[in-house]
């Protein structure tokens, strides 16, 4: 038994397991057959509460239901060496259960390195009448339990339920304010309760809703050609990635986003064919430059650890420039003795279709990434003083030298 003896983490890199405790397929299931009407919430008339949108919802607040959740998490972590857990519809679980699960995992050898994050929403009205593990109660969750931040997603690429609604990357007027909030992981905004930046999962696409590529094309065209290369959509894709990969928080991307994954405009593909949902590796070759762009940004981010800080006050060090709208620019000094490659970062976002000139802070700034290449930092790239040119639809990153 290769996996049982070595663990998934030895075979691959690190494995996150999607755990869907929030519902069962139907009322007649193994848990309900064990103790009828115990593991699932009921309405006042005795019918099943349906906060999952799938017919029932798991009663995490009940002692033996909570124990079932935590014991099974520990089993996966100990026997299969799972490196993290992603909780489907986490808003259907109570805060106490989630914090107890965090404490139980932390007690394992190396358990504090196990990730925990989830969807802070529900799939319908719920009978959970205590503190839900959602955005409103973020301050009550352990600082190492993260949430998918739909505020960040919608600010960058536009609302997920309206295919034609643009976001900052597509040039939506006024959205630069929300992008500033996203950069700070919403720690400097009253949009969310007090929290650590590491609790914010910064992303623009996941398995639900439109892929980033499809969304960009649906905003631009009435009848998009999803499989065709589009230079503007590629630039906007790089801009979107450049924003959330230079923001505070925990970055997340959908598999294939890095090579312009398409589901042919299908907004919710959970019932679609394997052919539509599969990863098209030919696109990885076709869009290898986009793959390289993601790879370079991830490596750049790893060399500036402050962006991944767990300190709730770390985003306070951000300084935002006063620029012509809708440009966004900011600078962030490195934390003392954190091994950063640069003394500070200076980042600009340009969501327009024209080049823009922006002033730079005092000093010499090395160009680390521009609108097309994110690996300029690896070599002897050009240094700038006083001002710099931003390409259309671009995220541009400088490092203080």
Write out the residue ranges for each language-model feature.
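Single conserved hydrophobic/aromatic residue that forms the stacking wall/gate
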Residues: 1-12
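Short, well-ordered coil/turn segments that N-cap beta-strands
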Residues: 13, 18, 81-83, 110-114, ...
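Aromatic- and acidic-residue-enriched segments that line the glycan-binding/catalytic groove
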Residues: 23-47, 131-138, 265-275
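Active-site neighborhood of glycoside hydrolase catalytic domains
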Residues: 26-127
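Alpha-helical packing segments of well-folded alpha/beta enzyme cores
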Residues: 65, 69-76, 97, 203, ...
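Conserved alpha/beta catalytic core and glycan-binding cleft of carbohydrate-active enzymes
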Residues: 102-103, 108, 112-259, 266-270, ...
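Carbohydrate-interacting/catalytic domains
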Residues: 230, 234, 245-253, 257-259, ...
């Amino acid at each position: 038994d290769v996996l049982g003896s070595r663990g998934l983490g030895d075979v691959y890199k690190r494995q996150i397991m999607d755990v869907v405790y929030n519902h069962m397929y139907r009322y007649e299931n193994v848990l309900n057959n064990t103790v009828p009407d115990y593991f699932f919430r009921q309405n006042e008339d005795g019918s099943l509460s349906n906060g999952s949108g799938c017919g029932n919802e798991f009663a995490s607040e009940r002692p033996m239901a909570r124990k079932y959740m935590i014991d099974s998490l520990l089993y996966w972590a100990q026997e299969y060496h799972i490196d993290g857990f992603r909780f489907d519809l986490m808003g259907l679980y109570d805060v106490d259960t989630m914090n107890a699960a965090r404490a139980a995992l932390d007690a394992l050898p190396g358990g504090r390195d196990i990730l925990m994050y989830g969807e802070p929403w529900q799939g319908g009205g719920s009978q959970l009448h205590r503190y839900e593990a959602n955005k409103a109660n973020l301050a009550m969750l352990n600082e190492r339990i993260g949430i998918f931040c739909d505020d960040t997603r919608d600010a960058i690429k536009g609302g997920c339920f309206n295919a034609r609604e643009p976001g900052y990357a597509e040039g939506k007027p006024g959205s630069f304010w929300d992008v500033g909030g996203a950069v700070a992981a919403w720690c400097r905004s009253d949009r969310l309760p007090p929290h650590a930046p590491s609790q914010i999962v910064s992303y623009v696409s996941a398995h639900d809703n439109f892929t980033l590529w499809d969304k960009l094309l649906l905003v631009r065209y009435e009848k998009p050609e999803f499989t065709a290369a589009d230079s503007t959509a590629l630039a906007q894709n790089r801009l979107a990635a450049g924003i959330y990969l230079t923001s505070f928080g925990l970055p997340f991307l959908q598999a294939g986003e890095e090579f312009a994954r398409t589901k042919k405009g299908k907004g919710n593909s959970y019932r679609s064919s394997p052919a539509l949902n599969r990863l098209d590796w030919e696109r990885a070759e076709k869009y290898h430059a986009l793959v390289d762009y993601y790879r370079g940004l991830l490596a750049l981010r790893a060399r500036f650890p402050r962006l991944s800080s767990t300190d709730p006050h770390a985003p306070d060090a951000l300084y935002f420039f006063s620029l012509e709208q809708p440009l966004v620019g900011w600078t962030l000094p490195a934390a003392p003795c954190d091994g950063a490659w640069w003394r500070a970062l200076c980042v600009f976002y340009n969501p327009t279709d024209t080049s823009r000139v922006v002033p730079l802070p005092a000093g010499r700034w090395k160009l680390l990434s521009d609108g097309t290449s994110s690996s300029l930092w690896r070599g002897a790239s050009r240094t700038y003083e006083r001002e710099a040119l931003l390409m259309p639809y671009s995220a541009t990153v400088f490092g203080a030298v």
